[in-house]
Design a protein with these regions (language model features):
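Short solvent-exposed coil/turn linkers within tandem alpha-helical repeat scaffolds
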Residues: 46-52, 83-89, 119-130
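Acidic, proline-/serine-/threonine-rich low-complexity intrinsically disordered segments
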Residues: 1-23
């Protein structure tokens, strides 16, 4: 997309955190990962105590992961899984942290991280557990 289209998709300067978050989600869906990164960073910097901060931090990690920026993605997912460990995003953040570590060639650490998902979140959604199992096989844990 051209720069004009990206600008048009962003909410106004006075947008609420929810509006910014929704805009970032839309950017991800359109595969505008750099734009999504910028939007989620804006939320994190401007509203660090908002209830959507764990989600915004997770989605920042997604925008980085999808561009194979595994190191920065890992940092975002680690933050969600430690600082916001009780958030709904935490189990999936641990999964994505493991995937990021695998992308960095850190197989042992990735495998240990995958094991943490079930240990820390035994009641997590079956879709997350199944994804962990797939990743463990893919990585060779």
């Amino acid at each position: 997309p051209t720069g004009g289209q990206q600008v048009a998709a962003l909410p106004s300067a006075g947008a609420t955190v929810r509006e910014l978050y929704d805009a970032g989600q839309s950017q991800l869906q359109r595969q505008d990962y750099a734009g999504a990164e910028q939007t989620f960073r804006q939320i994190i910097q401007s509203s660090p105590n908002d209830r959507l901060i764990a989600d915004a931090t997770f989605m920042l990690g997604e925008s980085l992961f999808l561009r194979q920026n595994y190191s920065d993605a890992a940092a975002s997912f680690l933050e969600v899984s430690t600082k916001y460990q009780n958030s709904a995003r935490a189990p999936e953040a641990l999964l994505r942290l493991g995937q990021s570590l695998a992308g960095l060639g850190e197989k042992e650490t990735a495998c240990a991280t995958f094991q943490e998902v079930d240990r820390k979140y035994p009641r997590t959604a079956s879709s997350v557990r199944q994804a962990v199992e797939r990743e463990q096989k893919r990585v060779g844990c």
